[in-house]
Curated annotation (Swiss-Prot):
Active-site feature positions: C804
Biased composition (Basic and acidic residues): 280-289
Membrane-spanning residues: none
Subunit architecture: Interacts with HOG1.
Gene behind the chain: PTP3
Protein name, entry field: Tyrosine-protein phosphatase 3
MF-aspect GO terms: protein sequestering activity; protein tyrosine phosphatase activity
Segments forming domain Rhodanese: 111-232
Region (Disordered) residue spans: 247-307, 467-487, 672-713
């Protein structure tokens, strides 16, 4: 999607430190990287995304089990097109270059008849603003280069009024002719083609008359800034030309219609959408539509500009493409502003994905192309009776037929059941509202506040050296935020866990961003080497501020004092994420029907690059992160998505050692397919891993004995020598790595557990969510065990780190799924309040609400509509697993119970030795 590029220098905003008071202080001594560590150079940091993948030949979409679906809204990402460098020419002999100041003096001192201003810019630019009294003369590049197309021929193709003015002025001796376009920094050896071509033709035209031809060096934009009084933005060149030639009466124009052709410009509306050779000349009582302070409308015609229809290039003059209907001042460039916001776009993307799923689930369709029919036969059209429903809604209907209503009510919340019955377009429009709210939030609230905060980089060339700045500070054990404290939402508070008034937060329609919800993007905009993508920046109020104990770096001046060092030291592209915490009224009598797991705080961040591995581990140490969820492969289609930060090495003073790796193969959903078949090919999830349907294996990849039906849970560790090589890993499996971090001359060890889901593509989804839910199960097991063994106190809020490639789409999707599963009690309470308030026209959707909250803390959480729909799929799959836990339902032939249930998956996790040893090792870190 994006590469790390240099970004323009923008003044950052620095609020009160968003780091908790008791965060771990990381100071790393200066060491040389080992052979596995990245080269610490500016060149490598800027080219960290162009490594070649050993799997570059792998297909974009693999039709294995859990095959990913890669869709970016309605279309795939567009590769940048090649744009050749603009051709420049030497300044013509007999022509001079003048500055903007000199042109300003000429306009102010010389009379108008002694000055001729020629605007050679394209008509779309000329139509917006011009230098007063300019005449627009623009030729195609082919005619500019053609020497036999002289200035006399150019005059013959202009309008009669323009011809009259130009001929009368060109007959005057000592005429000052100034040619300008939008090109800046024109020199003796570098002149733009339009200025060169027109100047050359003017110098050779009528050499008997003395004239001075000059080219504006700085271009029109700079002159507009220096002399705004000489700029006209309300008229076009027909109005700029003095009325030396009286306008012909309407009758004369109509009588000479056979010698004229319509001339496109922007003052008179077209009489009909069809081609009409009649010139409609408005009277003097025109409305305000002739006042053009913005770009002109294309549906207009100049009333007094007839041109000869015999001219071969008459149709090329003043042509302009349709301008946008609205001129939105975009303060920040992001996908929602660049892409179409119509509902049809979202529906089209959803339909394409679901059509792919239906094709994949149809075994007969995959066997041969002979089944293809166009158009579809009548029988297939009659069967398609669920056009107004999404795929997960159809699966829910089939699921509800297999279970009693009481059982479903005890597992599936009421709000989720209601969402299963609403029309497809209403659910899709929820995501459209989310995009609209984020677009409004960014365009309205993004500001850089230059007056309040100043940031001056005196020596940009010293930036790469600043990345290696180190100090030897004492590292303190991490402490965790107290969730019982009532916290006010502010720019200085990264933890969004205040007791909130929920009336205005129950639906997207009632969302209104207050001043406390304003987003600021400042820090990191200028740090291109620390950002993986050029349009993903952290919000200032929730960004993670690193604490390395560094002194202010050389060459940096701050308008405020801070103990966190400079922006080069404390910056990482990461944000804190957390849902608001609501208090349940004491006299409230409702009881929740679903279980609730431990709440956590998330750190959403981009995948590390070679230049940011040290910052990545510093973030983990500062916040006491025990668990990292990695949702991306290291390479996709030959493009690096994540640097292998788990490789052993010395990363600027932080030593990384890979202790152990487990490969968790996902169980098959073949038996699930049989048990969830309803009517007409409607399985709950039919795409699964082929092989054993009852085993959840934990091994390395050479174990292919999957035909037995025993529950053999072998805990086979991959050797340390093989840990660095992931080429043979099964992409459908979950990888668990135990990593040891040491720092300060190996005096302070810190263990970290990484869970990696490799088969989730960028900007895409999975056909089978079992690997996502199993990763969440591992997370829950670790957090619950740490609480049970008193690693955390009951009032502490653990922090986990989640990353994909950009830290937005897949990261936001998983954080939303986990937050819904962890906050059933809160959402059931909010639903009851929603019913009390009686919002008949509004929809209570905790999923959309959660995404909206997260998008106020980090940009573009859940990037596209298919990831949004995938969240509902995952929740339905979770409820399906829970239903199997509480029922004794058997297969249709009365055989054994389906072994794939939530309890079966959790049981396999509890037997993993790597998790048990990790918790034991974490408890040993407490005395530090």
């Amino acid at each position: 999607m994006k590469d790390s590029v240099d970004c323009p220098s923008i003044l950052p905003t620095d609020r009160t430190s968003v780091l908790s008071e008791t965060s771990t202080l990381v100071g790393s001594s200066s060491h040389v990287y080992s052979r596995h560590a990245p080269m610490n150079s500016y060149h490598n940091s800027m080219n960290s995304n162009i490594y070649h993948s050993p799997k570059a030949s792998s297909p974009l979409v693999s039709y294995k089990t859990s095959s990913p679906v890669l869709l970016k809204r309605a279309t795939a990402p567009v590769l940048p097109s090649f744009k050749p460098k603009e051709q420049r020419y030497n300044k013509p002999q007999g022509c001079s270059l003048i500055t903007a100041v000199e042109l300003g003096k000429i306009i102010e001192t010389l009379p108008d008849e002694k000055v001729l201003l020629l605007d050679v810019r394209p008509f779309t630019e000329h139509a917006k603003s011009i230098i007063t009294n300019s005449i627009h003369v623009c030729l195609p590049s082919t005619l500019l280069r053609r020497k036999n197309f002289t200035f006399s021929k150019l005059l013959d193709n202009l309008t009669p009024s323009e011809q009259s003015v130009l001929k009368s002025k060109l007959a005057i001796d000592n005429l000052r002719i100034i040619i300008y376009d939008s090109t800046a920094n024109q020199t003796e050896s570098s002149v733009s083609l339009p200025c060169y071509g027109i100047a050359s033709k003017l110098i050779e035209f009528d050499t008997n008359v003395k004239k001075t031809v000059s080219i504006l060096m700085c271009g029109f934009p700079q002159f507009k800034i220096l002399f705004p009084d000489h700029i006209n933005t309300n008229t076009f060149n027909s109005d700029c030309i003095s009325s030396a030639e009286p306008k012909s009466p309407k009758t004369n124009l109509m009588n000479s219609l056979h010698n004229t052709a319509p001339h496109m410009t922007a003052t008179t509306p077209l009489s009909s959408p069809q081609m009409n050779l009649k010139l409609k000349v408005p009277d003097d009582s025109r409305s305000d539509h002739s006042n053009f302070s913005s770009s002109p409308s294309p549906r207009n015609v100049l009333s007094d500009s007839p041109m000869s229809s015999s001219s071969p290039i008459s149709a090329l003059f003043k042509f302009q493409l349709p301008a946008p209907q609205t001129n939105i001042n975009q303060m920040f460039k992001f996908s929602q502003n660049e892409e179409i916001m119509g509902l049809e776009t979202y529906l089209s993307a959803v339909n394409i994905k679901e059509e792919h799923e239906r094709w994949y689930n149809n075994d007969s369709a995959k066997k041969s192309l002979q089944n293809f029919q166009f158009p579809k036969n009548q029988n297939s059209l009659e069967k398609d009776t669920n056009k107004d429903k999404l795929g997960f809604q159809i699966r829910y209907e089939n699921l509800s037929k297999n279970y009693e209503k009481e059982v479903i009510d005890s597992v599936i919340p009421e709000w989720f059941q209601h969402l299963m019955s609403i029309p497809k377009i209403e659910l899709v429009s929820q995501f459209q509202k989310l995009d609209f709210l984020e677009k409004r939030r960014l365009n309205h609230s993004v500001s850089f506040r230059k007056k309040e905060n100043s940031f001056i980089l005196e020596k940009p060339s010293s930036y790469p050296e600043q990345l290696t700045s180190t100090s030897s500070s004492t590292i303190m054990p991490p402490k965790f935020p107290d969730v019982n404290k009532v916290q006010k939402r502010s720019h200085s508070q990264p933890i969004f866990t205040q007791y909130s008034k929920y009336k205005s937060m129950l639906s997207l329609e009632s969302d209104s961003d207050s001043e406390s919800d304003d987003v600021i993007i400042s820090s990191g905009v200028e740090l291109g080497a620390k950002n993986r993508y050029k349009d993903i920046f952290p919000y200032e109020h929730s960004r993670v501020i690193l604490k390395k104990g560094l002194q202010s770096s050389k060459g940096i001046k701050h308008s405020h004092s801070t103990s966190d060092g400079g922006i080069l030291d404390n910056y990482i592209n990461a944000n804190y994420l957390s849902l608001p915490r609501f208090s349940v009224e004491q006299n409230s009598s409702f009881q929740t029907t679903t279980t609730t797991t431990r709440r956590v705080r998330y750190i959403a961040t981009q995948a590390p690059m070679p230049s940011t591995v040290h910052d990545f581990y510093t973030c983990i140490l500062n916040n006491g992160v025990p668990l990292v969820l990695s949702l991306t492969n290291d390479f996709e289609n030959g493009i690096e998505k994540c640097y292998r930060y788990w490789q052993e090495g010395n990363y600027n003073g932080i030593h990384v050692k890979l202790l152990e790796k487990k490969i968790l193969k996902m169980p098959s959903t073949t038996s699930m397919r049989k048990n969830t078949m309803g009517t007409q090919n409607s399985s709950l999830y039919s795409a699964g891993v082929q092989g054993n349907s009852s085993n959840y294996s934990t091994d390395n990849d050479n174990d292919n004995d999957n035909n037995n039906n025993n529950n053999n849970n072998s805990n086979i560790a991959v050797t340390a020598a093989a840990c660095d090589d992931d080429d043979d890993d099964d992409d459908d499996a979950i990888l668990i790595r135990k990593i040891l971090l040491t720092y300060h001359d190996q005096e302070k060890p810190y263990e970290l557990l990484q869970i990696q889901v490799k088969n989730w593509p960028d900007l895409g989804t999975l056909l089978n969510p079992i690997s996502i839910l199993q990763a969440i199960n591992v997370k829950n097991h670790i957090i619950d065990t740490l609480f049970a063994r008193n690693y955390y106190q009951n009032d502490q809020l653990p922090t986990i780190l989640v990353h994909c490639s950009a830290g937005c789409g897949r990261t936001g999707t998983l954080c939303t799924i986990d937050s819904i599963l962890s906050n059933f009690e809160m959402f059931e309470m909010l639903q009851k309040e929603f019913v009390k308030l009686k919002y008949p026209a509004k929809l209570f959707d905790p999923i959309s609400w959660t995404i909206n909250i997260f998008r106020k803390q980090r940009i573009s959480m859940v990037q596209n509509i298919n990831q949004f729909i995938f969240i509902y799929d995952c929740l339905l799959f979770y409820f399906r697993l829970r239903l199997d836990d509480i029922t004794e339902r058997t297969d249709g032939d009365g055989s054994n119970k389906d072994n794939i249930s939530l309890s079966a998956l959790i049981e396999q996790i509890e037997k993993l030795e790597i998790l048990q040893t990790f918790v034991d090792d974490k408890l040993k870190e407490l005395p530090q």
